[in-house]
A protein has these predicted regions:
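Catalytic machinery of carbohydrate-active enzymes
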Residues: 1-403
Length: 403
């Protein structure tokens, strides 16, 4: 059967044609909470909008702006706020769209800006509190992921500097300063006045309540069979030291007399003349576990100890985290600065003795003798010089039940 061109045209014309709907081009609103609340407007319609960023908990308008299509806007606040974002037609003032922060079931990426041991151990459990409150999926980046990934299998751990994808919100935990001025768009308040852990609670919008992390500990035996106490008399700054002359040796002798071995576990080597001079001489009658050994060995030493005695340093935070009874000696920082679950030994007469310069001054790490108020005077380091060994012994007796 043959067809002419005319017949084909007629056949085509007789076909019932389906009417396709016309495509309507509209602008699209996209919301995210990466380093703060953000509203993006995409689309071809030339139109102006009013965007409002509202703190729902305070019922407070934080930021309002006018936007066109193919622009984005955000307030500069990077810490958690329970945001509501509203978009209005500028011409009619009609509410066109809104979005309330809701992380349930979504990926939230939380990064730690610090590699310090204390910061990491203090801030990590707050992330767990955030997860439980918002029922979100946590992606986390720390400098010590190997301590935690087995303890928090429900989280995704990424290395520092690595990207995470398909995230709804991102928060960075840290102390953020610019020219010694707190950056209040990243930290809600001056962090030097707070417990270290509250830094994370504030940034993540949580009520502060001290909590401890779960941390992987080595499956190793006790370092010695006898009962023992760990000491860590060194720290990263001289101002952190316990400066009472002969104080550490007095404590060691007392513990030995009561039948306890004493393990010294600092990175600074026992027998090094310069380091020993900061302790009044080489400490005697200790088991030397100092030096560049793996941190896992120190964690194991602390975990099995009957007691840990240290300063405001990372090893004290490890002791707190692994739930070993802890005595923390410091006049350099105010008692609220570190953790509360310890015996905190502080300057005995704080009203008349200088103390807590850490909380009000900026440490000069290049000056080992830094003491902002009394350097080169007879009051140099008086904050810890005035802490007597008997005060420490009284705390030892309480923990070890020595009468």
């Amino acid at each position: 059967m043959s067809f002419t061109t005319d017949s084909l045209v007629k056949e085509y014309s007789n076909i019932t044609k389906k009417v396709l709907p016309s495509k309507t081009f509209e602008n699209k609103f996209i919301y995210s909470f990466i380093h703060g609340a953000k509203c993006e407007i995409f689309g071809p319609l030339e139109k102006e909008y009013i965007i409002k960023f509202i703190d729902k908990d305070k019922n407070e308008l934080i930021y309002e702006t006018v936007s066109k299509n193919n622009h984005w806007h955000k307030p500069n606040i990077e810490y958690f706020v329970n945001w509501r974002i509203e978009v209005y037609d500028k011409e009619t003032n009609e509410l066109l769209d809104s979005h309330d922060f809701d992380a349930e079931g979504k990926n939230v990426f939380i990064t730690l800006d610090s590699s310090a041991i204390g910061d990491t151990l203090a801030w990590l459990p707050v992330i767990k509190q955030f997860e439980e409150k918002h029922k979100c999926k946590i992606i986390v980046s720390t400098f010590h992921n190997d301590w935690f990934y087995k303890e928090y299998p429900e989280w995704e751990f990424v290395s520092p500097g690595m990207q995470a994808f398909d995230i709804y919100a991102l928060y960075c935990l840290g102390w953020f300063y610019n020219d010694q001025q707190i950056e209040l768009h990243k930290n809600p308040q001056e962090v030097k006045n707070l417990p270290l852990q509250q830094t994370a609670s504030d940034i993540l919008g949580l009520e502060y309540k001290e909590s401890k992390p779960r941390i992987s500990t080595p499956k190793k035996d006790r370092p010695v069979e006898e009962k023992y106490v760990c000491i860590a008399p060194h720290a990263s700054a001289h101002a952190k030291y316990w400066m009472y002359p002969g104080g550490w040796q007095t404590i060691i002798d007392y513990l030995n007399d009561k039948g306890y071995k004493v393990l010294m576990i600092t990175h600074e080597v026992l027998g090094d003349e310069w380091h020993d001079s900061k302790l009044g001489g080489t400490l005697q009658n200790v088991i030397d576990k100092t030096g560049n050994g793996p941190l896992s060995d120190r964690i194991n030493d602390i975990k099995h100890a009957d007691l840990f005695i240290g300063l405001g340093s990372g090893l004290s935070w490890i002791s707190w985290a692994v739930r070993t009874p802890t005595i923390l000696i410091s006049g350099f920082s105010a008692p609220h600065t570190e953790f509360q679950d310890c015996e905190r030994i502080f300057t005995p007469d704080p009203d008349n003795t200088c103390n807590s310069c850490f909380n009000r001054e900026w440490l000069n790490p290049g000056d080992w003798e830094w003491c902002p108020d009394h350097k080169d005077t007879d009051r140099h380091f008086e904050c810890s010089k005035t802490i007597e060994p008997q005060t420490v012994i009284n705390s030892i007796n309480k923990f070890l039940k020595i009468s």
